[in-house]
Each structure stands twice: as structure tokens, then as C-alpha cells.
Amino acid sequence: MSTALVILAAGKGTRMNSDLPKVLHQIAHAPMLEHAMRAGGALDPERTVVVAGHEAEMVRAATAEIAPEATVVLQEEQLGTGHAVLQARAALEGFRGDVVVLYGDTPFVSAETLERMIEARSRADLVILGFEAADPARYGRLIMQGESLEKIVEFKDASDAERAITFCNSGLMACNAEVMFGLLDQVGNDNASGEYYLTDLVELARAEGLSVTAVSCPEAETLGINSRADLAAAEAVFQAHARAELLDIGVTLTAPETVHLAFDTIIGRDTVIEPNVVFGPGVTVESGALIRAFSHLEGCHVSRGAKVGPYARLRPGAELAEDTHVGNFVEIKNAEIAAGAKVNHLTYIGDASVGEATNIGAGTITCNYDGVMKHRTEIGARAFIGSNTCLVAPVTVGDEAMTATGAVITKDVADGDLAIARVQQTNKPGRARKLMDMLRAKKAAKAKG
């Protein structure tokens, strides 16, 4: 049976106190909407529909980046969850499979949970996702009779016995498309808020003799985000889970609580991560690497045995081959560092390639930007770049070539050549004492007025 996703992303998120739509606030460097879409993507959906409302164009633009094949529809008035799903009807015209309804502000539901919901749909007409709440608070209660879901009772309407139930409603559901929209046509808004509730489908389905069941998942998967405090708590949940997974696969985190990971961070076994390291999106670290304290990595690839930091920054496009060294206060951007090369101190390497076993001296700068365009620097294998060298791109330094300390290299250096490009030193005997005496006299005269 084919599957479609309907992701509700229309809420304004008033408590976020933000100009940004709630679903576009980020957890682990990805919008909450992307987390929901990634989980749903594991079902290989035939269609994906995002229901937008507040700042719909921002949601539309973000959706196009995350999943260009998805359709965005508009809920012009916020008239409840049932009304929101109805806005997806035209986008699902002709679809006869199962529809899974997700929430863009509930980012942690797992692919495994969604797969279990689809499996349960083969046995029931309507499937609701529930969870055992540690503190049921004011959640709606799922009233079960064996495997059958009898009804959903909102907290305010629940009896004392029903409030004692800890199996609660997450809001997520799965249902055949024709059945779902047929039931939604019957949902009314005769309630205090004048809204159309998706949860009314349970009662309507049972009234038509349809079977309804519930699938359970861990409470953490149903965490909804409504405020900045919720967002911070969700970030902490994600980070704790991601760190635990790394520890389980054989990565050493010397101070786990200080390491910040992105949603897509990949780190191989036997890699050591020291304290206060930040991983932005798009980072892969192979096995046996060392990432030292206070380093920041994003959009880069670190190969086996490489050493990074402390206080290093790897920006998008940085590619470190095996056994490379990138040391303290070094920044690498859009550059390939070949096997065994060393860039150990106080250096910027941008839009460049560094050959195998080459040594880059402290203070080296690739001058890659002319104010309008970026240019590349090519450094060959087994070269030696002297400290405080400025490489003015575009420029090439050949294999086994050298640059003298303090050189400003504006011309290509051939294989094996030594390039010296600095002003010749001149010493003036006794001039320093005379100069200092003159300066002190000026200072004294100024002090006297």
C-alpha cells in the first residue's frame, strides 16, 4: 500500500515570540520541519503535503530546500487540526493509499514508530499514536478496550477514573485517504473554540463501524515544541541521545555533555572527541581521528588518523586526508589537505589544495579574495611553506618547493625551487638609542604642556 504524508506546519507559535514560523526553529542545526520530514521520508511516501499558514512563504521556501518534491498548501484561517488536514485534499486527489498525519513541531517521532503505525493500519481502519506519560498533566486520554481504541477523552472532560489513565494522545494518526477525508467532512466545530478537531475522527469512525486502534511509542518521541524553553529542552534531548549513540558505537567523548552535534554528524569508531567541540551540519569524521578541544567543524570530511585542533575551524569544503594535522588557530575552507600534510599553527587555507607530506609554516595565509572573486592556491607534495608566507592567489607552488619566511608569493614557484620575496634587512648602528631618546624627549615636552 502506498503512503502519503500530511505535515501540519501552519501554527504561528505565539509563545516562541519570534518572526520565524515555529516549525523553522532549529534543533541540531535543522528546522523542526526537516526532522519531521526526514522521519516520514523513511516510509518512502508517494506524496508529501505540508500545510502552511503563518509566514507561509518562508515555510514554502524551506520545504523546497528540504524536499523539492513536496507540495505546500495554505491554511488561510487557523480553524483547527481537522480543518488543516482538509486543506491537503486537493493535493491528494486520486491518491488511494494511507495518509500519515505528522506535526511540524513534533520533531522526534522515529521512522520505526511510523513503520509500526503503517503495519497497524493493515489491521485497523484508523491508527492513533499514543504514549505512556510520566506526568499525564492535561493530555487527552486514550481509552482502550483490548486492542481497540474506544475514544479519546480530553482532560477537562475526563472522569477521575479516566484521568488516572496514563496512555495519552500524541495527535499523530494514520488512515486510508478516502476514509479520512470522508470522516473529516463530518467533523463539526460546535465547541468552545469553534475549531475542527482531528481527534473527532475516532468517535466518527466508531459510529460508522470502523475499527480504531492505538500504537504506543516512547514519550520523548512525542515532545512538542511551543516555547523557547521547550526548544532548549528538545535540543538537550537530541544531544543526549546523539552522544549516547556515539558512545555505543565506540567513539570516545572525554566530556560528552560539552560536545555539540548536528542532526547529520557521522563519526567513526575509535575517534576521540575532546571537550567543547562543535559539529555543524555536513560533517563526517572517519575512524581513529582526534578532534581536540574547542574546535568547530561544519561541512567537512576528516579522514582516518587525522588530528584537528585544539581551537581549529574546518569550514564547508574542507577535506582532510589520512594522517593530516590541522593545529591551533588554523582555519580551512574549501580546501583539500593531502595525506600526511601538516598545517599546525595560526594559518588560513582557503580555496586551495595542499599536497602530500607538505608542511605549512605558522602564520601562512592564502590570499584568495581580490574583493570581487575567489582564486585558488595550489601547493604540491613535500613542499615547505615558510612561516608568515602570503600566497597571493591564483598561484602555484610546486612539488618539493620552498618559500622563505615572510615571503609574499605572487608568482608560481616551480618544482624544487626556493622562493624569496621580502625586503632585504638593513641594520642602522646606534639608531635605536637615538630614536628612543628623541621620543622620550617629545613625551616629556608634551607632559609639561
Swiss-Prot record:
GO MF, any single term: UDP-N-acetylglucosamine diphosphorylase activity
This protein's record includes keyword ATP-binding: no
Keywords: Acyltransferase, Cell shape, Cell wall biogenesis/degradation, Cytoplasm, Magnesium, Metal-binding, Multifunctional enzyme, Nucleotidyltransferase, Peptidoglycan synthesis, Repeat, Transferase
Region of interest called N-acetyltransferase, as start-end residue ranges on this chain: 250-449
Entry's Gene Ontology BP terms: cell morphogenesis; cell wall organization; lipid A biosynthetic process; peptidoglycan biosynthetic process; regulation of cell shape; UDP-N-acetylglucosamine biosynthetic process
Family per record: In the N-terminal section; belongs to the N-acetylglucosamine-1-phosphate uridyltransferase family. In the C-terminal section; belongs to the transferase hexapeptide repeat family.
Protein known as: Bifunctional protein GlmU
Organism of origin: Ruegeria sp. (strain TM1040)
Native organism taxonomy: Bacteria, Pseudomonadati, Pseudomonadota, Alphaproteobacteria, Rhodobacterales
